[in-house]
Amino acid sequence: LQPIDIGHPKYLALIDPDTAFWSLVKPNKLAGVLAGDDELLRTYRKKSARFAEEMQMLRFGLKPSAVYFNPTDRCNLNCTYCYIPEKMRSSGRHMSRKRLLEALRRLRDYFRRTVPKGSLPQIVFHGAEPLLNRDAVFAGIEEYGEDFRFGVQTNATLLDDETVEFLTSRHVSIGISLDAATAAVANRTRKNWAGEGIFSQVLEAMERLRGYDAWSVICTVTSENMRHLTRMVEFFHAREVPTCLMNIIRCTLPGARTVKPSDAPAAKHFIAALDRTYELYRQSGRKLPVANFSNILLAIVAPTARRLMCDISPCGGGRCFFALATNGDMFPCSEFIGLKKFRGGNLFKHQVEDVLDTEAFRLVTQRKVEDISPCNRCTIRHFCGSPCPAEAYEMNGGMDRTGAFCEFYEEQVRYAFRLIADGKEDAFLWDGWDKGTIDTFVAP
């Protein structure tokens, strides 16, 4: 067990880096615990093998249950940080209705072989902008509504009344994007090909979605908007957004690196925004979970209950989900679309199982923190996972390199432990997050 300073006045965290077991310890008790004079260490040792097995299963024993499905290469926006190459977005192709239905049939047949009965795999129509190919997407949702849980990730510019009615009536999850609470900031990085911002269109879509329980908003944290994150969560809360994400920018392609923030200020503003969500909850009784941070909390308090798989190694790419390009090419994750080295095969030509076992996929599914320096010496490595492999490869030159950020993730974990020490963690998690979980360790 290794101690880390979490910045709390009363507690340190003791962590086993290999199993992600942890405990909060008062500094004056630390020496006794480490010397074995405390019941905590003796009790932990009795169960450490079980914790190791759980971590092994979480990291290496899962199979895909979701697909990020690009029904078109094209987008009506030209956002600064997009990970899809500009040429694809400006002049790419749509997947035909017939081809899209065939792809869903093949995916259904694959998941019937692998997903336990009673569980539905997930298809997220992603992009680029999937609603540019709306008719084909809607045909797929109609045809295979009993076989998949569907979602759509959209820039919201095409979410008119008819589209919202179709999606909400079929309980399709809807994710939209907005980077700030004012047009002046939001339009800096998210704009159309003419350079015009889309802030007002997104607000109109948010009003159409108000009251629906299955929508969320992604805010990408950049150097352009990080100082406005507190205002952002106030804006989301006032508009009754059920869940948001404040994802630190992925720096896979050069354009994104032009708006990359430094770790320390990004962490400072991010944590200030999280503090504000707690204040809003205390004032209103209504939570605003910031899902990417909620996932960090879950990684600590209930590792196997986490919903997102970017903050563990290997990440979820190629082992919990994979991405499908418009021409049927398969990639471990959407971040790799446009990087030919990571094309594993084609859905229309190859068996999914065979693609998952290709070298292109193994580059991602076998990337682990134990092989990355300095991550292999980091106490919190299983609460972070050294994301993202796409940016590690493209930005820093190899899969054995770190991604674009380090301190940012460290500060998130320290903050999460402080919340746990103060008994506040439930305010940052979804209602019912612990349904179906069991206690595997209770501190003596």
Region roles according to the model:
Residues 27-28, 136, 336:
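Residue-level structural signal for beta-strand termini and adjacent loop
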